[in-house]
């Protein structure tokens, strides 16, 4: 059977000029994969009315999506809390630009049926289905039969608050989870040999912590037939686990996020207020050197997830460590920076109550061993 090498990166925001430059540090790893997948965080449009239910992200230039193709990305997931920030026009312009650049997409569309439909990928004769769901709201971003938006899984907050990214989300709606599971089964029945589920989930800007719903929801995707589950949204790495022999990356952190929309020194009042308020809400002060990526200081540790399949069977799981250079550019990490990423992943897994990952450095990646019960320290 052919070998299938899948590499996944986290959130992508390419507001700044020269997007090829910002992606150049990770492009070699993306290009070398059989399939490379990322999460597109914001609409790429110059049109549309701002959504009022969340702090709206500005639309990025549609022509910047060509840089994703240049960097080697084959597909993007779209179901997230910002994809509808410029309304239906913003979604349509994003889909059009992705199509023009030959980038497959899933998770947002002009109605809910299209948003829930998988992106179909193929490499070496192996058919891969990619599905994408927003688990954090806002509800106004969710697609309906008559409204553009994203595919979603409803997660109810504590105390009946509105479903929104900053809410204390805890309780997955069984009907929503059932629809996701049916999507996975439908993809299998339609011929998917490998199925990947991407979940926009979790708590932003806080190290290690997983919301109560995150692990059960990822497990449900595997129970339905997913071979790989990837998470994003937190803008900081989350831990890893195997469930029934299938890898779950609970949060890939940032793939490449370079934007001035998170600066408190800007003219947009709600974005400037959010940039100030999030520091107070989440208890961190960004490193002033990271002017285009003012996230939690621990967000400098990143990774590209890598899973190798022998045909339809996963045979190796691991990651390529990333480091973010000021003002926010990701690069493949080596030496002490790579060691720091490995040690950080071990620590956040333990802090989140996940099994301690057993890491082995190989020529191809940092491999995560699935079935070891005792692991010697990888690094000093």
Short names for language-model regions:
Residues 1-380:
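Acidic, metal/ion-coordinating pockets
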């Amino acid at each position: 059977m052919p070998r299938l090498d899948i590499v996944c990166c986290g959130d992508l925001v390419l507001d700044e000029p020269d997007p090829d430059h910002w992606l150049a540090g990770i492009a070699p790893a993306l290009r070398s994969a059989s399939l490379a997948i990322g999460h597109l965080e914001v609409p790429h449009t110059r049109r549309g009315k701002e959504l009022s239910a969340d702090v709206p992200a500005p639309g990025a230039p549609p022509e910047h999506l060509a840089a994703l193709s240049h960097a080697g990305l084959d597909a993007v997931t779209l179901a997230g809390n910002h994809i509808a920030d410029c309304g239906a026009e913003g979604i349509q312009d994003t889909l059009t630009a992705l199509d023009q650049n030959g980038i497959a997409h899933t998770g947002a569309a002009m109605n809910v049926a299209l948003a829930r439909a998988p992106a179909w990928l193929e490499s070496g004769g192996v058919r891969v289905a990619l599905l994408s769901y927003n688990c954090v709201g806002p509800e106004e971003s969710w697609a309906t039969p008559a409204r553009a938006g994203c595919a979603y899984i409803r997660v109810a907050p504590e105390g009946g608050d509105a479903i929104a990214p900053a809410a204390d989300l805890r309780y997955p709606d069984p009907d929503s989870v059932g629809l996701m599971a049916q999507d996975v089964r439908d993809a299998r029945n339609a011929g998917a040999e490998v199925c990947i589920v991407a979940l926009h989930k979790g708590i932003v800007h806080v190290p290690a912590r997983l919301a109560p719903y995150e692990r059960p929801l990822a497990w449900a995707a595997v129970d339905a037939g997913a071979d790989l589950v990837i998470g994003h949204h937190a803008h900081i790495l989350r831990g890893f686990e195997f469930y029934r022999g299938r890898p779950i990356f609970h949060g890939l952190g940032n793939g490449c996020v370079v934007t001035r929309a998170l600066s408190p020194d800007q003219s947009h009042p709600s974005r400037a207020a959010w940039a100030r308020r999030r520091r107070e809400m989440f208890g961190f002060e960004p490193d002033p050197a990271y002017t285009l990526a003012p996230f939690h200081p621990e967000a400098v540790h990143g990774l590209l997830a890598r899973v190798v399949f022998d045909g339809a069977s996963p045979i190796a799981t691991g990651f390529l460590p990333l480091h973010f250079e000021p003002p926010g550019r990701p690069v493949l990490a080596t030496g002490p920076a790579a060691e720091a990423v490995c040690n950080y992943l071990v620590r956040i897994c333990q802090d989140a109550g996940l099994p301690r990952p057993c890491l082995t450095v190989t020529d191809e990646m940092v491999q995560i061993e699935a079935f070891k019960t005792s692991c010697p320290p990888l690094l000093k």
